[in-house]
From Swiss-Prot:
Its cofactor is Mg(2+). It comes from Nocardioides sp. (strain ATCC BAA-499 / JS614). It is an enzyme of class 2 (transferase). GO terms for cellular component: plasma membrane. Belongs to the glycosyltransferase 4 family. MraY subfamily. The keyword Acetylation does not apply. GO terms for biological process: cell division; cell wall organization; peptidoglycan biosynthetic process; regulation of cell shape. It catalyses: UDP-N-acetyl-alpha-D-muramoyl-L-alanyl-gamma-D-glutamyl-meso-2,6-diaminopimeloyl-D-alanyl-D-alanine + di-trans,octa-cis-undecaprenyl phosphate = di-trans,octa-cis-undecaprenyl diphospho-N-acetyl-alpha-D-muramoyl-L-alanyl-D-glutamyl-meso-2,6-diaminopimeloyl-D-alanyl-D-alanine + UMP. It is found in: Cell membrane. The gene is mraY. This is Phospho-N-acetylmuramoyl-pentapeptide-transferase. The chain crosses the membrane at residues 3-23, 51-71, 80-100, 116-136, 154-174, 185-205, 229-249, 256-276, 281-301, 341-361. Its EC number is 2.7.8.13.
Length: 364
């Protein structure tokens, strides 16, 4: 518990102070955000706001985690290092995307195909390592499993390695892009991430307290077959603290944006937590806001293509997608949209944690 508190607190402090430094440096270097022309006109005033603040979130998380390891004297675990690799790797893809936008002074960075290739490489490396036998512990358990998981592994569904790698890629790509789509209003994705990563911190703490590796329980419905749950909680706490510190400067009116560097990194780390904690399907509930944002874009594209094919004129389901911009176009103030979407996130997190705990209680 000391490592969790220290890691989260140190990450918060580094992020809070580091973001202020980043704002000054990025402003001096001219690392400003370019705004899409088809978005709400009110967003044009944000052009030039420093971006790539995700660099600070990533740095604060890494410092927070390893600082906690120094305090406790414990060695880093394979699961935590894999999660940090995913955070940094997906963040690097976002960094390249942001840098292209800044250097070319346009709202389009990496092309979709190039971005997906980058995410695919990171996801496959993560997947192969997390399933590899040489990272198994003395109980023969690898960081990731070959089962589909909800609250825990669904034991009767064992998948071939190729299928598992495909699912890992899908979860990482979908979650990264989901957080990326949500990051369109001041503080929206950051605040939502605080709640979801905070929820995963508590999930990991509970899994550690009921861990099959230390409780001696032989009932699979009362303990959790998860690798290194306490160390995953330290990383989740560090990310939560880093997002809290960044939110101080990212809240409306934002003094800095996280950019694709931050949104892809947070999405990748969130997917990694779901995979490593064996709660992939639970992520759909906990990260309900990110799912909603992604589905709104999918419905918008599908509706436009279908109506264009049928009538010759494409029609849109929403005024603009993702859906948070739709409500802006309806006349909602930006802060109103953000707070109400945070409320949605809070409801999703409460529902997800409730389902998680209820499943354990039902097994008693």
């Amino acid at each position: 518990m000391r490592a969790i508190l220290f890691g989260g607190g140190l990450a918060l402090l580094v992020s809070l102070l580091g973001t202020r430094v980043a704002i000054n440096q990025f402003t001096r270097l001219g690392y400003g955000q370019e705004i899409r022309d088809d978005g709400p006109t009110s967003h044009h005033t944000k052009r030039g706001t420093p971006t790539m603040g995700g660099v600070v979130i990533i740095l604060a998380t890494v410092v927070g985690y390893f600082g906690a390891k120094l305090i406790t004297g414990d060695m880093p675990t394979a699961s935590a290092l894999l999660l940090l690799f995913l955070l940094v790797g997906t963040g690097l893809v976002g960094f390249v995307d942001d840098f292209i936008k800044i250097s070319k002074q346009r709202s389009l960075g990496l092309r979709s195909k190039a971005k997906m290739i980058g995410l695919t490489v990171v996801a496959l490396v993560f997947g192969i390592l997390s399933l590899s036998s040489w990272l198994e512990d003395d109980r023969g358990q690898s960081p990731a499993s070959r089962h589909i998981s909800f609250i825990r592994d669904i034991g009767w569904i064992t998948l071939p390695t190729v299928v598992v790698l495909l699912l890992i890629w899908l979860i990482i790509a979908a979650t990264s892009n989901g957080v990326n789509l949500t990051d369109g209003l001041d503080g929206l994705a950051t605040g939502a991430s605080v709640m979801v990563f905070g929820a995963y911190m508590f999930v990991n703490i509970w899994q550690n307290n009921q861990w099959c590796g230390q409780t001696g329980l032989d009932q699979p419905n009362l303990c959790y077959e998860v690798r290194d749950p306490l160390d995953l909680a330290v990383v989740a706490a560090a990310i939560t603290g880093a997002c809290f510190g960044f939110l101080w400067w990212n809240a409306s009116p934002a003094a800095i944006f996280m950019g694709d560097t931050g949104s892809l990194a947070l999405g990748g780390a969130l997917a990694g937590l779901a995979i490593l904690t064996r709660t992939e399907l639970l992520l759909i509930i906990l990260g309900g806001l990110f799912v909603m944002e992604t589905v709104s874009v999918m419905l918008q594209v599908a509706t436009f293509k279908a109506t264009k094919r049928l009538t010759g004129t494409g029609r849109r389901l929403f005024r603009i997608a993702p859906i948070h911009h739709h409500f802006e176009m309806l006349g909602w103030e930006q802060v109103t949209v953000v707070i109400r979407f945070w409320i949605i996130t809070g409801i999703c997190v409460a529902a997800g944690l409730g389902v998680f705990y209820a499943e354990w209680v039902a097994g008693i």
